[in-house]
Amino acid sequence: MADSSFDIVSKIDRQEVDNALNQAAKELATRFDFRGTDTTIAWKGDEAIELVSSTEERLKAAVDVFKEKLVRRDISMKAFDAGDPQPSGKTYRLTGTLKQGIDTENAKKINKIIRDEGPKGVKSQVQGDEIRVSSKKRDDLQAIIALLKGSDLDIALQFVNYR
């Protein structure tokens, strides 16, 4: 019998993020406590989101609104890295980035967790920005998925191509 395997990836659905951004922009435009603060939210490039407001408190509230919309669209908070508010003239600016892909540092952490705490006979290998995990038994693969979901990593993980 051939080995069973799955891939560990860290990807976000850009369309869902765009929907969350549009919902947040609509709420910021219509909510009473944001009137007169010139609070805006928009894309800045491909992987960054920029929020602008007249006060730092309204800027933090706008970030909370955006995070709430992300959660409702089933996007992990680990995928959005909000920067620090920067004063810019009469306004405050915040640029948040979206994190995708598994970098080498996190790949090493995941491989170490699988090696140290996972069942014996499970092999993992890094393939670009994803990790392929394989084993003879499917139960071992399910144990690895449960182990990684319970671990405290600073990236959002998805498990795909379960064969």
From Swiss-Prot:
The source's domain of life comes to Bacteria
Protein's UniProt keywords contain RNA-binding? no
Q: Which GO terms describe its cellular component?
A: cytosol
Q: Which UniProt keywords apply?
A: Nucleotide-binding
Q: What terms describe the molecular function in GO for this protein?
A: nucleotide binding
Q: Does the keyword Transmembrane apply?
A: no
Task: Please name one Pfam family that this protein belongs to.
Answer: DUF520
Recorded hits in InterPro entries, A to Z, give: DUF520, UPF0234-like_C, UPF0234_N, YajQ-like_sf
Query: What SUPFAM superfamilies does the record tag this protein with?
Result: YajQ-like
| Gene3D superfamilies for the chain | 3.30.70.860, YajQ-like, domain 2
PANTHER family in the record: UPF0234 PROTEIN YAJQ (PTHR30476:SF0)
- Known role: Nucleotide-binding protein.
- Put simply, this protein is called Nucleotide-binding protein MAB_3912
Q: Which organism is it from?
A: Mycobacteroides abscessus (strain ATCC 19977 / DSM 44196 / CCUG 20993 / CIP 104536 / JCM 13569 / NCTC 13031 / TMC 1543 / L948) (Mycobacterium abscessus)
